[in-house]
Design a protein with these regions (language model features):
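Active-site helix of classical SDR
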Residues: 42, 46
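Conserved Rossmann-fold NAD(P)-dependent oxidoreductase catalytic core, especially the SDR/UDP-sugar
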Residues: 1-40
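C-terminal substrate-binding subdomain of Rossmann-fold SDR/epimerase-dehydratase oxidoreductases
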Residues: 93, 97-209
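NAD(P)-dependent short-chain dehydrogenase/reductase
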Residues: 22-24, 55-109, 114-123, 150-153
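Active-site proximal helix/loop that lines the substrate pocket
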Residues: 13-16, 72-78, 126, 141
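Active-site beta-alpha turn of Rossmann-fold NAD(P)-dependent dehydrogenases/reductases
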Residues: 9-12, 69-71, 137
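Structural signature of beta-strand start/N-cap positions in the alpha/beta core
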Residues: 7, 64-66, 132
Length: 209
């Protein structure tokens, strides 16, 4: 506002959508349920609030601000100690150890390659509409946690490791199973297209871990 910027992008998240009941494409205008009493809800609730502030500044002060709702993003540069499930699977492939899931791995989400996320951000910054949000993902990567583990074990580790679901896994620290298939037609209308599948992303990731 004070610096008279030409444009800014707020990096939001697909977690903003909360719990979606349907296994169908979800557009930017659709939102699911977030339990305000769940302590983990602080993250998606904060994303919703920040997007609202961006929209308010765009409307009241004409600040050119755009929101991108990123799917889980990964590629070269991820730390070897990263705690996220995709990184854990990459480590297991490198170490030749079985992938142990504490849940059944039924949650389904899309992903996007890091470099593609960057091009999406610039696409929105240069061609998007101020105050609006844009989903960013590669629909071809949409799969369950278990399915992703099978891909890593069979294609990345060449069948040398297995995916095992723990019989007595501690599921208390994990979110309830969910599905979230992002509709990216809005950003595609700006000319952006996703390119890289999960196998390609994993191969690139592992080379740099």
């Amino acid at each position: 506002k004070e610096k008279k910027i030409k444009g800014m992008v707020y990096l939001s998240s697909m977690e903003l959508y909360g719990k979606i009941e349907k296994d169908e494409f979800v557009s930017e205008s659709e939102l699911g349920y977030i339990d305000p009493l769940n302590i983990r809800s602080c993250y998606p609730e904060s994303k919703r609030m920040c997007e609202n502030l961006c929209a308010c500044y765009a409307a009241e002060y004409e600040v050119p601000v755009y929101q991108v709702r990123l799917a889980q993003t990964f590629g070269p540069g991820i730390s070897y100690e990263d705690k996220r499930v995709f990184a854990m699977m990459a480590r297991k492939a490198i170490e030749g150890k079985d992938i142990i899931l504490q849940t059944k791995g039924t949650s389904k989400h899309p992903y996007v390659y890091t470099a593609q996320a960057v091009t999406a951000i610039f696409t929105v910054l240069l061609g998007g509409k101020s105050g609006e949000a844009y989903n960013v993902s590669n629909p071809e990567t949409y799969c369950s946690i278990y399915e992703m583990g099978k891909l890593v074990s069979e294609k990345v580790a060449n069948g040398k490791i297995k995916v095992i679901v723990a019989k007595n896994g501690d599921i208390s620290k994990y979110p309830v199973p969910s599905c979230l298939k992002l509709d990216i037609s809005k950003i595609e209308n700006l000319g952006w297209k996703p390119e890289h599948n999960l196998l390609w992303m994993y191969n690139r990731l592992i080379k740099t871990m």
